[in-house]
Structures are given as C-alpha cells and as structure tokens.
C-alpha cells in the first residue's frame, strides 16, 4: 500500500496518511487527495503541507504508530490520523491554558 503523508501548520506533530492504492497509475491527473477526509474535520485542519510519499510494503516499521493499524485504517477509510504523543499533547494543552490565563490577568 502506498500513501502520501501531510502535516498541518495549525496542528504540531499531527500527520495524516492518505491511501494511494492505485499508485503509480493514479498520477495522470491532479487530484485532491485530502478529499477523503470528512469535510468538518478537514476544515478545522487549516493549510496542509505535503511531507512525503511512502510505500508501506517496503517499510518495516513506523516511528510512532503501528504499521498494521495504519494499513487497516487506510484500507477501511482511506486515511489515517497520527496524533502527537500524549506527553506532547499535555504540554501543548498546559501552554494554551497558561497563555489564556495570562491574557485574562495581564490586560
């Protein structure tokens, strides 16, 4: 299974894998590969940036996610969302809370 990986400027350390089951025979026309994402979800992501193309058949392991889980999601829904590790998410939430609190009391 081939896939393209995208990241989003509004969401640090979040990556979305988009299935490309017909690669390389699907490159004749320009296509909105992110069109497989639910519209509401996609709207909240902001601007995307292509990271890389990956052939999962020749990739033994992935750094932060289980390869079999990625393959299953790509096959069933056409995409996989890789969220940041919990410690990163917690740190980001704490920072946002602190910034919000500072803006309330420093005005």
From Swiss-Prot:
<protein>
    <recommendedName>
        <fullName>YcgL domain-containing protein Pcryo_0807</fullName>
    </recommendedName>
</protein>
<feature type="domain" description="YcgL">
    <location>
        <begin position="1"/>
        <end position="95"/>
    </location>
</feature>
<dbReference type="InterPro" id="IPR027354">
    <property type="entry name" value="YcgL_dom"/>
</dbReference>
<dbReference type="Pfam" id="PF05166">
    <property type="entry name" value="YcgL"/>
</dbReference>
<dbReference type="InterPro" id="IPR038068">
    <property type="entry name" value="YcgL-like_sf"/>
</dbReference>
């Amino acid at each position: 299974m081939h896939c393209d990986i995208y990241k989003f400027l509004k969401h640090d350390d979040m990556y979305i894998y988009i299935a490309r089951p017909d690669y390389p025979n699907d490159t004749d026309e320009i296509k909105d590969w992110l069109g497989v994402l639910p519209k509401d979800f996609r709207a909240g992501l902001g601007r995307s940036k292509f990271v890389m193309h990956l052939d999962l058949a020749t990739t033994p392991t992935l750094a932060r996610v289980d390869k079999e889980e990625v393959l299953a999601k790509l096959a069933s829904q056409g995409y996989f969302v890789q969220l940041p590790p919990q410690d990163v998410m917690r740190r980001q939430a704490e920072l946002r809370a602190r910034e919000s609190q500072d803006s309330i009391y420093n005005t």
